[in-house]
Amino acid sequence: MAALADAGKITIGTKFDQPLFGLMSPSGTPEGFDVEIGKIIAGDLGIDAGNIKWVETVSANREPFIESGQVDMVVATYTISDKRKEIVSFAGPYYNAGQAMMTLSTTDDITTPDDLAGKNVCSVEGSTPAANIAENYPEANLVLYGAYTDCLEPLRNGEVDVVTTDNVILAGYVAESDGEFKVVGEPFTEEPYGIGVALDDTEFRAWINDVLDGIFADGRWLAAWQDTAGVVLPDPAVPTVDRY
């Protein structure tokens, strides 16, 4: 942590394909709620936004990028789980999502995950939603890609019946679909989003947790939300940091 502050630069992994949370803009820099959280943390280290190196980090490479030191932290719709805690350390959560489903607007036979039996269900390799479907809904035909955007065209052309990931991610795709897609049913899991850092860097984790508690209280967290995901989604409840 001190080395980052002294260097005045930081490398942050985030998604480049998720509207509202992490999406590459035409200007060549990512935008979204995760990106704003990353900027706040960097800023509190004394690092200007222009000295952040953003690295595209998909679900399958979040842990490898942290372990190898390719990134200093990951802010990428990254669900905290006990299994992942064995590999990386998590600060947060800074947002609580839930797994949901997205279909074509014309689909009317999928409303709960129990309806997925025999359906082609698209998700992403290395993701919590994919693991949940494989474990709890084995009669679904799971189709895995490297990124959620890779699921969109198969959904359009009928190769898959449904896309599943966190509700807020799907909301971003629906918002950009001009009525083509819809989110169906209610969230059926709890997905607390955390900030991933190196497993042994407990000092950095604790410091980020302090930053999160601070921005929950001073309004910067809510402002970051309202400027990004909050354009489409309602204001969320303030999470409680898990100082495990």
Predicted feature residues:
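Extracytoplasmic small-molecule ligand-binding "clamshell" domains
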Residues: M1-V74
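Periplasmic-binding protein-like
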Residues: Y95-T103, A171-L212, V231-Y244
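Bilobed "Venus flytrap"/periplasmic-binding protein-like clamshell domains
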Residues: D17-P19, P30-L45, T79, A97-L152, ...
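Acidic, polar ligand-binding/catalytic clefts
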Residues: K39, N51-D115
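Extended ligand-binding regions for polar small-molecule ligands
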Residues: V35, D44, T107, S127, ...
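Ligand-binding clefts/hinges and TM-proximal coupling segments of bilobed small-molecule sensing domains
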Residues: T128-V143, V183, D213-Y244
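Short, Asp-centered acidic motifs that coordinate Mg2+ and/or phosphate
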Residues: I10-T11, D72-M73, D161-V162, F181, ...
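A ligand-binding cleft/hinge motif common to bilobed small-molecule-binding domains
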Residues: N61, T77-E86, N132-E135, R156-E190
